[in-house]
């Protein structure tokens, strides 16, 4: 059944107009963007198929290639291009917010950006957000990549990068592809080692985030682990 044949109160667009976007499911929001379905499937059905293909995770969907998106029945290259453009605009909007001087007074913005960057990665990635003395972003840099379960991080190389960017502070982050955001003993020990090494060159570690799946990134600072 086409969405136009649904009761008005159940149609995604009408629900958004009445209750706002936060009231809609991921599939309903995608359906509004897709606009129309295909023979035998409404736009909501098509959106559900799309989410199912990418494990129900918007982060994984956002990282999919054009070819991967277009391979879903009913999507095609035109809709795939529209989706990629939408995800890229979201990334750019967050990046622009990150470049403003008050970016790092809002942990929520940092979390959102890190989730976009790291949540769907299939292997561990360790990155640093280098900041100046006013906590304005100098550079977001992926320093090390590893396997599904671990990555090797070398404090000496992190210190070299800090000096190269003339950084005054840093926010560290890495992902757990397992989907579990809890820090391991190795994570805690590494954080202490990096904090001590960077302190030797007057670079302050403001936080260390672990990004895992759709859960909010875990903050070492909030856990009292810094």
From Swiss-Prot:
Keyword Protease: yes
BP-aspect Gene Ontology terms: proteolysis
Intervals of motif JAMM motif: 174-187
One Pfam entry name: RadC
InterPro entries per record: MPN (IPR037518), RadC_JAB (IPR025657), RuvA_2-like (IPR010994), UPF0758 (IPR001405), UPF0758_CS (IPR020891), UPF0758_N (IPR046778)
The MPN domain, residue ranges: 103-226
GO molecular function, one term: metal ion binding
Residues that hold Zn(2+) according to the record: 174, 176, 187
Domain of life, per lineage: Bacteria
Keyword Protease: yes
Family: Belongs to the UPF0758 family.
Name of the protein in question: UPF0758 protein Daro_3142
């Amino acid at each position: 059944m086409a969405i136009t044949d649904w009761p008005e109160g159940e149609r995604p667009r009408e629900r958004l107009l009445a209750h706002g976007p936060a009231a809609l499911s991921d599939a309903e929001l995608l359906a509004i963007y897709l606009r129309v379905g295909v023979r035998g499937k409404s736009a909501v059905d098509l959106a559900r198929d799309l989410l199912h293909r990418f494990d129900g995770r918007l982060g994984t969907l956002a990282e999919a290639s054009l070819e991967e998106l277009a391979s879903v029945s009913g999507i095609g290259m035109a809709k795939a291009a529209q989706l990629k453009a939408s995800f890229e605009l979201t990334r750019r909007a967050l990046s622009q917010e990150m470049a403003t001087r008050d970016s790092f007074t809002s942990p929520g913005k940092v979390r959102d950006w890190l989730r976009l960057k790291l949540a769907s990665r299939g292997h561990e990635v360790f990155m640093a957000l280098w900041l100046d003395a006013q906590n304005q972003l100098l550079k977001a840099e992926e320093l090390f990549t590893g396997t599904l379960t671990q990555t090797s991080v070398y404090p000496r190389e992190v210190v070299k990068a800090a000096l190269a960017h003339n950084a005054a502070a840093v926010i560290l982050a890495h992902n757990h592809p397992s989907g579990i955001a809890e820090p391991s003993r190795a994570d805690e020990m590494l954080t202490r080692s990096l904090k001590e090494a960077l302190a030797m060159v007057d670079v302050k570690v403001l936080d260390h985030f672990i990004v895992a799946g759709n859960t909010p990134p875990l903050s070492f600072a909030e856990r009292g682990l810094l």
